[in-house]
């Protein structure tokens, strides 16, 4: 239990997907202009990441790894070369289901997210979560915690950035820095702030 709690804190703060690995930057920068849209996308990423990382873990463990099909009486088969395409398929299916649910029950949020909801399918933060899970050889419980933590870390980062940028609307920013210029500087300073969590011993 202590190990899982440590993994959760590490994935949210120390190894933050947006501010430590700079993954998912396209939607991170585009959707951080309004705090409501940022919260909506953040929640969507948390849900997709929490479901896809453990789903891909099960797929890898019981279908793709070497001798993973031993439960079906098939041995000596290694399908790990299909990992990328399989992970993308799982992610696409889950995002599609989520898109249909949001369209039906949360139309305002669905319209606010616009093109960025289907873009979660190809958002590198989602694929990155599954690939880190494979690289670090997480078991199922770890993959659930890591999926939630990495999604939550990304969501916290985008909501913080949206809050800062909304406050900056009332600031006298030099003309040359308006728009993406000040956004990049802000993200860099946020990243430096999150680096301080690296000194925590867990």
Swiss-Prot record:
**Which compartment or compartments is the protein found in?**
Cell inner membrane
The main place the protein resides is: membrane
Q: Where are the transmembrane segments?
A: 11-31, 35-55, 81-101, 114-134, 144-164, 180-200
Keywords, alphabetical: Cell inner membrane, Cell membrane, Ion transport, Membrane, NAD, Sodium, Sodium transport, Translocase, Transmembrane, Transmembrane helix, Transport, Ubiquinone
Q: Which Pfam families does the record cross-reference, listed alphabetically? A: Rnf-Nqr
Q: Which GO terms describe its biological process?
A: respiratory electron transport chain; sodium ion transport
Record-listed E.C. numbers: 7.2.1.1
Q: Which reaction does it catalyse?
A: a ubiquinone + n Na(+)(in) + NADH + H(+) = a ubiquinol + n Na(+)(out) + NAD(+)
Q: Which cysteines are joined by disulfide bonds?
A: none
Q: GO molecular-function annotation terms?
A: oxidoreductase activity, acting on NAD(P)H, quinone or similar compound as acceptor
UniProt topology in membrane? Multi-pass membrane protein
Would you tell me the Gene Ontology cellular component terms?
Gram-negative-bacterium-type cell wall; plasma membrane
Which InterPro entries is this protein grouped with?
A: NqrDE/RnfAE (IPR003667), NqrDE/RnfAE_oxidrdctase (IPR050133), NqrE (IPR010967)
Question: Which NCBIfam families does the entry mention?
Answer: nqrE (TIGR01940)
Q: What does this protein do?
A: NQR complex catalyzes the reduction of ubiquinone-1 to ubiquinol by two successive reactions, coupled with the transport of Na(+) ions from the cytoplasm to the periplasm. NqrA to NqrE are probably involved in the second step, the conversion of ubisemiquinone to ubiquinol.
Q: Which family does it belong to?
A: Belongs to the NqrDE/RnfAE family.
Q: Which PANTHER family match?
A: INTEGRAL MEMBRANE PROTEIN OF SOXR-REDUCING COMPLEX (PTHR30335), NA(+)-TRANSLOCATING NADH-QUINONE REDUCTASE SUBUNIT E (PTHR30335:SF1)
Q: What assembly does the database describe for this protein? A: Composed of six subunits; NqrA, NqrB, NqrC, NqrD, NqrE and NqrF.
Specify the protein name: Na(+)-translocating NADH-quinone reductase subunit E
Organism annotation: Cellvibrio japonicus (strain Ueda107)
């Amino acid at each position: 239990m202590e190990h899982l709690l440590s993994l959760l804190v590490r994935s949210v703060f120390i190894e933050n997907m947006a501010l430590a690995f700079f993954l998912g930057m396209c939607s991170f920068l585009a959707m951080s202009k309004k705090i409501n849209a940022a919260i909506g996308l953040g929640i969507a990423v948390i849900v997709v990441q929490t479901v896809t990382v453990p789903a891909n873990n099960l797929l890898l463990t019981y279908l793709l790894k070497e001798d993973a099909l031993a439960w079906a009486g098939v041995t000596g088969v290694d399908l790990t070369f299909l990992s990328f395409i399989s992970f993308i398929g799982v992610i696409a299916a889950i995002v599609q289901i989520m898109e249909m649910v949001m369209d039906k029950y949360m139309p305002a949020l669905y319209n606010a997210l616009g093109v960025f909801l289907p873009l979660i399918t190809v958002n590198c933060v989602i694929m990155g979560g599954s690939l880190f899970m494979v690289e670090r050889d997480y078991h199922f419980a770890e993959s659930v915690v890591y999926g939630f933590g990495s999604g939550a870390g990304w969501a916290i980062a985008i909501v913080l950035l949206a809050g800062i940028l909304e406050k900056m609307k009332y600031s006298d920013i030099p003309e040359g820095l308006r728009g993406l210029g000040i956004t990049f500087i802000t993200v860099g300073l946020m990243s430096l702030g999150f680096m301080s969590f690296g000194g925590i011993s867990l």
